């Protein structure tokens, strides 16, 4: 079972700039992959398999942001395609717009690269960020990932995804 906690974060100026770059890079990779997949399918009738690593040689500024955020953009595009083919009423995947007032990116917790302690959160590439932790988190939960988002009013939030162990059901004999 998964549990998500959403907290307000207070990044400094350099962290805000990093988040803005990351939001832009994630949108760029998503849109670029979608465009290439559409174009390749129209030409050949086959599905193109692309990864964000392909773009880092061509666009070196993609190396400045968290690589897992770019990988999650690829996963989000794959999910959009799966949803479209599963149910056509969902609609074909759409390009992401700069004008959307809510920006976000998702990163995964690998080897403890995301840490929460003493009202501070450590994120890849961003470092330690002040956080308004208004509830405690059970120690039995395992941190799986984080989604950083910026709302239209320029407030930043983080949603932390935790995996909770399912309680084992006891089997009783009668």
For each feature predicted by the language model, list its residue ranges:
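Nucleic-acid substrate recognition interfaces
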Residues: 1-174
